Amino acid sequence: YRDEVRPILANNWEATYFDFDEEKILGLARTAKELGIELLVLDDGWFGKRNSDTCSLGDWYVNKEKLPDGIAALAQKVNEAGVKFGLWFEPEMVSPDSDLYRAHPDWCIHIPGRERTECRNQLTLDLSRKEVCDYLIKTIGGILDQAEISYVKWDMNRHMTELGSAGLPPERQKEMPHRYMLGLYRVLEEIVSSHPDVLFESCSGGGGRFDAGMLYYMPQTWTSDDTDAVERLYIQYG
């Protein structure tokens, strides 16, 4: 997509927030088609028990109460409606109220004996650890393998605190932030290179990640969470 014209997209987030089901998403897809929109993105809330921002990050399996037929079936139906299908992830995060955190509380960035500071009810996964990266590659990559997904919104909605890793000895703790980025690049290299037909868009509370490393993997970046049409023109064009 580096040299391609990007599709016009619509995102369900501000239309539905967490309150959606399959029929509501399909209704948005049909309306998008009528308006000449080429891609519909299903944002936060499709996985785990995610009915608010208080839980389930890291549990990347479909919420069958909202989408009983699963992501692959929804993607197929959206494509049949005449628009492509995109999906939101926040892979680097984990909710304390999640199956992943309960199984692996040491997988988040933390310092033993210190309080784990939550932002937006979430913690940051420790991507300096190989097993954490392996989990993301297998889980996120598996979803993309199984469904007709044309776009991924890769979100990141908090800053890092308590910079420590349970996978490093005390004398190497200062390596953690650098090793985190190496781990993230490995995850992106595996997932992006395995899915060359998917458009990946970086997002971090808006445009918080305009760095060369992310731009290498993400040919599109969400510029700002300010969606006022006039203000957005000033933001995007300086």
Placement of each model-derived feature along the sequence:
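Active-site neighborhood of glycoside hydrolase catalytic domains
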Residues: 65-70, 76, 101-238
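Short intrinsically disordered, low-complexity coil segments enriched in acidic
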Residues: 1-4, 173
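Aromatic-lined carbohydrate-binding/catalytic grooves of carbohydrate-active enzymes
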Residues: 3-138, 151
